[in-house]
Amino acid sequence: MRRRKAKMRAYERLLNYVKVYTTSEDEQENVPSTSRQFDLGNQLAEELKKIGVQDVRIDDKCYVYGVIPATEGLEEKPAIGFIAHMDTAPDFSGENVNPQIIPEYDGGDVKLGDSEYALTLKDFPHLVSLKGRTLITTDGSTLLGADDKAGVAEI
């Protein structure tokens, strides 16, 4: 099987995924805790099919599965699986997410949009090591949902 290369980069997928409302509900014992999590699950299943992943399916618990066969001649080597969750924490709103993209971060405090919130160097001293890089944050009005949609985007 010849796989097609994904045309989107991981950060582009992340920006798409964080906009899908997948906030969980703590009081629910069902898996998933909300049916809206299937919105992202179905989107992921379609994307996997488009890039040539085999046996793509989504089950009644919203787990998305797919198979990428071993490279010819390496079929006897150990297999690997990747796991990431799609739901986001109910601690703060995850609906109508507006990511804030900061190209060439200047190394200082990061104001989160027009909100009262900021990522300060006092609270997050490691930020200085990201100077010059592109940061993706929330605008402060919602959670970003990068836990674990960033993992989903990478996979």
What do these predicted ranges mean?
Residues M8, S35-F38, N42, K149-V152:
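Electropositive phosphate-/nucleotide-binding environments in soluble metabolic enzymes
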Residues E29-K77, G81-I83, D87:
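A non-catalytic alpha/beta surface segment that caps or lines the substrate-entry region
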Residues M1-K7:
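Short, Lys/Arg-enriched N-terminal segments with co-localized hydrophobic residues
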Residues L74-E154:
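Active-site metal-coordination/substrate-binding segment of hydrolases
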Residues V18, T22-E25, L48, G52, ...:
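Structural signal for hydrophobic packing residues in well-ordered secondary-structure cores
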Residues R13-N16, Q43-E46, E154:
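Alpha-helical scaffold segments in soluble metabolic enzymes
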Residues K7-S35, T137:
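N-terminal capping segment at the start of a domain
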Residues R2, P32-S33, L143-D147:
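A generic structural signal for short
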